[in-house]
Structure formats: C-alpha cells, structure tokens
Amino acid sequence: VPLQPYLRVLRLPGVPASILLMFVARLPMTAMGITLTLHVVSELGRGYGAAGLIGTATTIGSALGAPLIGRLIDRHGLRPAVALCGLASCAYWLSTPHLPYEALLVVALPAGMLTVPAGSLARQVLTALVPPPQRRTAYSMDMMSLETSFMIGPALGILVSTQLSSTVALTSIGIAFGAVAAVLYAANPPVRTAAESAAPRTARQPIRTWLTAPLVAALFIAVGATFVLMGTEIAALAALRASGEVEWTGVVIAVMAVASAVGGLVHGAVPRSLSQLPLMVLLSVLVLPVGLVDQPWWLLALALVPMNLACAPTLAATTEAVSALAPPGVRGEAMGLQDSATRIGLALGAPVVGFVMDHSAPGWGFAAAGAGGLLFAAVGLALQRRRVREPVPAATG
C-alpha cells in the first residue's frame, strides 16, 4: 500500500497534533460503556439488563445532544461547547461511583447529551485543516485512529476495574474527560477553513435548505453501517457462546478491528475508491454468509475478515459524503446528525439481531445484520433517486 498520501496529510500544519489529541480524547469514550456495566453489575449488584438500561439512556442522550452541540459550535465556536461538555462529563463520571442505581438511570440521558463530542470534533477539525482532494485520506486515518482507540479503551477500562476497582476506573474516566476538555480548550483547533473563517458571518440557514435528500440518504446509510457492525458483534458473541468458545471473543474482535484498519488504510491510499452506497452494500452482502461458517472460532474470525475490510472505508466515506453535502455554516450540526445516525444504528443493531437469534440460531444473526444493512442501503438509494427526479432547493447564503 503506498503511504505517500498519508505522509502528505501528516505534513499539513496542525494535522498530526490534532489526530493525536482526538485519539486521546476518544479513549475515555470507548472505555465508559464497559466500565459502567462492570460497576453496575459488580458494585451495585444489578443485572446486565439494568446496566443496559443506563447504556440505552446514555445512547439516546448522545443521539439527541450531538446535533445541538454541533449547532453550538457553528454559532459560537469550539471553546464554549468544549467547556460545557467537559465540565458536565467530568462532573458526571467523578460522581458516578458514589450514586445509587436509580440516580444513575435518571442522570444518564442528560449526561449523554453533554458528552464531549470527540468524534464530530475530529471530523470538523480535519475538514478545516485538510484540502478537499486529501480529505478521504484524512478521514481514513481518523477511522484507523478510532479502531485503535476501541482496541485500547475498553481493555484499559476492564483492566483498571478488575485489578483495582470500578470506582478507580470511573474516576479516571472523569479526570480524563476533564483533562481532554482543558487541552482542547487551550489548543482551540480550527473547525472552519481559513477561507470560511474570513467570510462574513450570515444568519443561520433553516434546516430545510440544507438537509437535502442526498444528505438524508447519507445519514440513513450511516445508520445502516453501524446497525451491521453492532449486529455482527452480537452475532459473533452468540456464535462463540453456542460453540463453547466464548474465551476467544477478544481475539475475534481484535481480528475484526485489524481487518477494518487495513481496509481503511487501503481506502485512504488509493487514488480512487468506492463511494458510500456501494461500500455499504458490500459491507452488508459480505456478512450474510458468515453464519454458514460460525465455528470453530478461528474459522469465524477468518470469515469476518472480508466484511470488516469494508468497515472503516464505509465510515470514512460517510464522513466524506456529509462534509461535502453540508454547507460550512452548519457543518457542526451536520456532523452531529452523523453522530446521532451512528448511535441510532448501534442502538438498533443489538436488539433486532438479538431478537432474531432468540427465535432461531446464532448463524441467522449474521443474516439479519446483513439484511438490515441492505434495507437501509435501499432507503438511501431511493432518496438519492428522488433527488435526481425532484431537485431539492439549493442552500442559500
């Protein structure tokens, strides 16, 4: 794989520091779910279902809050949003070890709304720092950074929770959120290009002028992508449990993450690549037959490699589509909607695929994940064709 495109992006001013900062910012986000689950189960004596309710409330809060935080960034810049979210996240996670379950359930949704938006911030900063011809490479690099954080963050959360205590782990997450917010506030990376910043500020555009059919299609496909990914993980875990090989779950997930990172590396390095919709279809189709070879564990891991090679490219292409379709003045809100779409997909994937497996077998979970992805892709295609037949009014301003 030629690495020159990545080297050229890394030579751009501000890019290496921003990628490193956003990688660190994502670590507490990737660790918080599993750490809070362990705390609810081990320290509060509740079941996994009770822990899942808190996770669901947090996810709903994040989905509701992401576009609102994005709008705040569009109107007032990065610092007010980072200060608000940083203080709220730090306070919530520092207090979490000392709250009863009922209180955690009540505050989970508002806390989710005010989570530091590391993902959308990373995409906005890269869009501001990187010229359009190089953005696919930059977004692919961001996806590889995300994969790495998902390999490290949960492992750190589990390690600290089991070797020390969940109280120490949750407190560490709170401190990390506060430190990340402080560094982001001090660094104040740009969220608009130099030309966009120099242009005179205009009134906020009504959402109907920029939330066009192609952008809605891109968001639907984003929901489908994370639906497939979450459904596949749940199906893989169920298959390993059914074959008595659940101890190999970590290895299988690691193989999936590495395959995704390799796919992202290739996607960002080649001169031309597939767009979001074909990648989404490829992601969905490749997971359909996995259930035919879901044991032993090493064969399952190998069967999941082709599908995961399309994972990071699909997510990177989603960011590329959203950044291209959203006007600069509402880019933060659009990136927030992208965050909401991905969280909705994650929230839908587990229960839908789980329901299918409860009434059949683990192998059908992979088929359900792929079929669901194709359904969302079909909706995206229909919206794109509607845009061709009936032009949506262009954004003004």
Where do the language-model regions lie?
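Helix-to-loop junctions at the C-terminal end of transmembrane segments
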Residues: 64-77, 161, 262-275, 357
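Helix-loop junctions at membrane interfaces in 12-TM secondary transporters
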Residues: 96-108, 292-303
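Cytoplasmic helix-loop-helix junction between adjacent transmembrane helices
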Residues: 109-148
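C-terminal transmembrane helical hairpin of 12-TM major facilitator-type secondary transporters
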Residues: 276-316
